[in-house]
Amino acid sequence: MASMAFTLVGAFKGMSLSSPCHSSSSASFLRADRVSLSVGGGVGMGVPMTMPVRRLTIQMAHKKGAGSTKNGRDSPGQRLGVKIYGDQVAKPGAIIIRQRGTRVYPGNNVGMGKDHTLFSLIDGLVKFEKYGPDKKKVSVYPYEKQPENPNSYRARKREYFRMQRERKKARAEGIVEVQLVLAAADESPEVNADC
């Protein structure tokens, strides 16, 4: 049938960076040169067509989108890590750990967010525990307040400062403090001398 003859005119012309016909420093294949197509079977039946060649340019929405090797160097940290440590009190919904991936697994009364953030589900104490040979988990246990020893240093110190505040307040209001006065016993003759 009809044979197709393709002639590429000027497609590879001027492959060097400095083209003699253009003062631009880009190669001709980056410019919009035209490709000539000849379609037809006979000698005089070919219909020459010219189609523009598209430029081979890379277009990005932003200048940082092109993938420069210098991008992302001075970016701030993500504030990851432990936020509430072991034996500290956590309220419901308080973030215990922010992490990438599951470095620490959730234990009792601890939930995990979609970004692997661990948070407390109840009010209680945070405890870090081993979970298998090489894993860790964090749990929150209900907080029971232990009764304090009244003779401990902390309790005596608290009581001492409470008494000091009361004395200072009484002095400021002008209330006379009751003081013990030692009275001397009067030796009177009516007292029984047999004693």
UniProtKB/Swiss-Prot annotation:
GO terms for biological process: translation. HAMAP family: Ribosomal_bL27 (MF_00539). The keyword Transmembrane helix does not apply. The gene is RPL27. One of its GO terms (molecular function) is structural constituent of ribosome. This is Large ribosomal subunit protein bL27c. It is found in: Plastid, Chloroplast. Part of the 50S ribosomal subunit. The keyword Plastid applies. Pfam families: Ribosomal_L27 (PF01016). Keywords: Chloroplast, Plastid, Ribonucleoprotein, Ribosomal protein, Transit peptide. Its main location: plastid. InterPro entries: Ribosomal_bL27 (IPR001684), Ribosomal_bL27_CS (IPR018261). Residues 1-60 form a transit peptide. Belongs to the bacterial ribosomal protein bL27 family. Gene3D superfamilies: 2.40.50.100. GO terms for cellular component: chloroplast; ribonucleoprotein complex; ribosome.
